[in-house]
Amino acid sequence: MAEFRKLVVKIGTNVLAREDGLLDITSISHLADQIAAIKEAGTEVILVSSGAVGAGRSLFEVPEGMSKVVRRQVLSAIGQVRLMEIYRQLFANHGLFCAQVLATKEDFQGHTHYNNMKNCFLALLRDKVVPIVNENDVVSVSELMFTDNDELAGLVAAMTNAQALIILSSVDGLLSAPPGEPGSQVIREIPYDDKRWLKAITPSKSSFGRGGMHTKFRIAQKAAKVGITTIIANGRRANILSDILKGDFIGTRFLPAESLSNVKKRLAYHESESKAAVYINSGAETALCSTEKASSLLPVGITRIEGDFQKGDIVRIFNAEGQPVGLGQAQYGSDTARQYMGQQGKRALVHYDYLYIE
C-alpha cells in the first residue's frame, strides 16, 4: 500500500466501549500505542474519537425525566473531560501532546470558521500533537448534528487534505451478504464509483453510536471520490492500524479517484451551503460531465435560476430533469447571471477550477 503522509483515524463508540457501554481502557490504550508509533514513523495523524457519552455514563447518573437530547448533552459534557484525560495520559507515555477540537456542522459551512479550523489543524500537526476531534454535542442538536462521527471524519479528511481515512468499527468491513448468510464475506476492495454492494448492507446501526454501515458506505465512497483512500476495518483486531499501513489487513478498502484540489474537496461536502439552484440544458450537462475535456459553466447553457446569490457563493447545479449535477462557486451574482442567461460569449458563471461534479 502506498505511503500516507497524513491520516484521519475515526474510532467508533463500539470500539471504545465495553458491552455495558462504559469505556474500554485496554482497547483505547492499544490504539493510542499504534497511533504513537505511526507518528514516530513520520506520518501525521488526526484522531476523530467517539466515546464522550460513554465516558459520561460511567461517571454520572442522569436524573429521571430528562429528555433524550438533554441527556446526551449532559453525558457528553461530563464525559468529554474524562475521555480527553485518558488520551492525555496515554499519549504522554509516548512524549506526545493531545489537543481537543470540538466541532459542529456550522464550523464547516462558513468560510471564516472553515479556514480558522483548517489553520488550527495545520498548526497542531507541525508539532508533537495529536488533534482529537469530536462533535460538540452540547450545542449540536437535531438538524445541526452530523449523521455521526463518520461524517465528521470525512469532512476533516477533506479539509486537511489527508491521503487516507480509516474508519474503525466493531466489524471487519463491508460484507457481501448479511452476517450468517451463506457466502457472506468481507468485500476487500470497492471502486469509488461502484454502488453495487449497497443493497447487501444490513440497514442497522451500532449498539451505542448513531450510525451504521449504510452511513459508512456513503461517507467512504464520497471520500474516495475526492481522492482519499478510505478503509473500513475492525478496531478491536490487534495491531489493526499497523497492519493497514503494511497493506496486510482484513477490511474493506475504497479505491480513490484522482485527488481533487482543496477547493473542489470543500465544494463536495457543502451541499447545505448552496445559496441557489442553477438549471442547465443537456448540452451544458454533457460538457460539464465529460471526462475528456475540462469545461466551465457558461451562461449559454443555463435555462433557469432559482434564488439569489452573490459573487463567491456556492450554487447547486441541476440538469433539465431536475437531477443534481454538481456544485460550483459563482464568479458573479445572480442579477448578472440572469442578464447573461442563454447568451453566448459571456464569462463563465462557474470556472472549472471551482466546480465539483457529483
Name each model feature, range by range:
Residues M1-F97, V101-E358:
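C-terminal catalytic "cap/lid" subdomain
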